[in-house]
Amino acid sequence: LIGMTRVWALELGPHGITANAIGPGPIRTELFDRANPPDAPRTRAIIDAVPVRRIGTPDDVAHAASYLLDARSGFVTGQVLYVCGGMTVGVAGV
């Protein structure tokens, strides 16, 4: 997906079209909560592995998408916007 995003950015840029991707980290969704109950040791381990010490929310991802959809971000293309609480900065322990 990242490779396709970069290719699309190069191919579509001359037409005024930007192409970007969002790279989410652990996001608190119904599926996440079913697999990782709030009081489970694994959930605590996931939170401890995130530098900001919390699980992301759908709103965190939506905010990133909103930024990329805004006309003022028209000079941003071919990028991955990681919404991961800093997990991609280093090696996660999970």
Where are these predicted regions, by residue range?
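Alpha-helical segment proximal to the catalytic Tyr-Lys
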Residues: 10-14, 74
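Short, flexible catalytic-loop segment of classical short-chain dehydrogenase/reductase
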Residues: 23-34, 83, 89
